[in-house]
Structure formats: C-alpha cells, structure tokens
Amino acid sequence: MRYSALLVGMTWLLLASPPPLGAHEHATGVVKERMEMMQQVAKHWKSIRERIDAKRDLESIKADAEAIAAHAPHIAHLFPKGSTQKPSEARAAIWQNWPDFERKAAALETESKKLANADPNDFDALSAEARAVTQACVACHEKYRSKRRKETR
C-alpha cells in the first residue's frame, strides 16, 4: 500500500507541476498544441486527485475523467515525426517505438473511461481506477518524456 501511495503521490507531482516559467511562450505549432493539451490533462488530473485525497465530491470525478478520456485519442496525432524542437520534452524513442507509444496513449483513454464509469460510492474501486490512470500516465512519461530541468520559476 505504501508503494501505491508513493506512486500516486509522485505521479500527482509529475502531472500537476507547472511547466518551467515561460515554457509555453517559446513553443510553437504542434509542440505548443500538445503542451497545452497536456496542461489541460494535468489540470483535470489535479482535480481528481484532490477529490480522492479529500474523499469528498467523488461524483464530480466523472466529468474530469471524461475530459481526460476526450483528450487521449488526440495524443498520438500531436506527435508527428520530428516534432522535438524546444521546449518539447518528447524523446526520439516515441518514433522509434511508435506502436508502443500509440498503445500507451490508448491505455490512458481506456483507463480514464473506466474511472469515469466507476461508482463514486465505492471508494476502493474508484481509487483503484485512479491508480490505473496514474499508471497509464507514468508508463508513457517514464519512457517517452525527457526529465524537466529544474529552472527558476
């Protein structure tokens, strides 16, 4: 259980932490589009985590999970080959392992839909589905996202 809590906590920090100051201002084109989309996903995920951590307003998790699921099918389209110009955090491994990347993006959609359909009155089931969404995010970010450099904010 401690491992699960640690994994969820680390993922929450990974997803909810804001980008370095000015990161989006230098992004253009598809890189900017995907950074903005990922920022929206992080916003919805933060809302979900706050509700689960507080064990309140759990029925409203559905809308945030549906929003994440709606973004997920667009992930692969926002990573055309060669779109690595800074401030992109995309690794070349995405295009070297394209089928795996697509599967991981699809897993986010699948797990987000399961979370949206989870019974808000069954906290254990809801938490389990939230962990599955966390694992979908981590699986992709660990392999395909460069680590952020610590910058002054």
Label each PLM-derived region with a short phrase:
Residues 17, 112-113, 137-138:
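A short hydrophobic/aromatic micro-motif that marks alpha-helical segments and, especially, helix-coil
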Residues 133-144:
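The canonical Cys-X-X-Cys-His
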Residues 5-16:
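Bacterial N-terminal signal peptides
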Residues 148-149:
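Short Cys/His-rich "knuckle" micro-motifs
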Residues 24-134, 152-153:
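Extracytoplasmic c-type cytochrome modules immediately beyond a signal peptide or single-pass transmembrane anchor
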Residues 1-2:
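N-terminal secretory signal peptides that target proteins for export/translocation
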Residues 16-18, 78:
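Selective for proline/serine-rich intrinsically disordered segments
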Residues 17, 23-24:
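Boundary of Sec targeting at the N-terminus
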